[in-house]
Amino acid sequence: ADFNASYIQLLGSLMGGMVAKHASSEIAAEWVPKVISGDVVIGLGLTEPRGGSDAANLQLKAEKFGNGWRLSGEKTSMSFADQADAAVVFARTSNPEGGSRGVSAFFVDLTEKGISRTHFDDIGTKPVGRGSVFFDDVYVPAENMMAEQDRAFGSIMAGFDFSRALIGLECLGAAQASVDETWAYVQDRE
């Protein structure tokens, strides 16, 4: 059993659901059908180098700029970092002290000027891939903000409750397949 085969579907469902529920109707209408058909991949820009288990302790900044926002910072250990066409990127828009208040989310086309990406040599999730994405004053239009400004963390992260349970089931499935293969080998060996 290959964990990656089901993980790819889980990420598509999670990210497509986030965009359908929290992005503008125009973005959802353009991108969700492409996610469903498998023509595009949307990544999740949440984890940062110093964040660890405190996912809301974000350093990536979003500052008002013209009729939009300018993103500066880094996301790391991001699934599909070097493959995704777009990403839901969480950034600090206020409350520099930290915490989930002051965190907003943006739908970002990862082909925009000022974005660079790296790939991690990862033995566990090669088909999915992981890496870092760097944002160097990347302009994002105001209409690409998802959910409510400064309060996106809680509302969007609620989608993870279901996906976390699915990841646990995926792990159990891979473990069961390993036990089954081992048992079959033990039964047949001489």
Give residue spans per PLM region.
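A short, Trp-centered hydrophobic/proline-enriched beta-strand micro-motif
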Residues: 38-46
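Hydrophobic, small-residue-rich alpha-helical packing segments that form membrane-like cores
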Residues: 52-54, 69
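A short core secondary-structure module
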Residues: 72-118
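Internal helix-loop-helix
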Residues: 1-38, 80-86
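Short beta-alpha junctions and helix-cap segments that line functional grooves
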Residues: 31, 58, 74-76, 118-121
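A structural signal for short hydrophobic beta-strand segments in well-ordered beta-sheet cores
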Residues: 60-63
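Short glycine/proline-enriched turns and hinge-like loops at secondary-structure junctions
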Residues: 54-56, 80-85, 99-102, 126-128, ...
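Glycine-rich beta->alpha junctions and the first turn(s) of the following alpha-helix
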Residues: 115-190
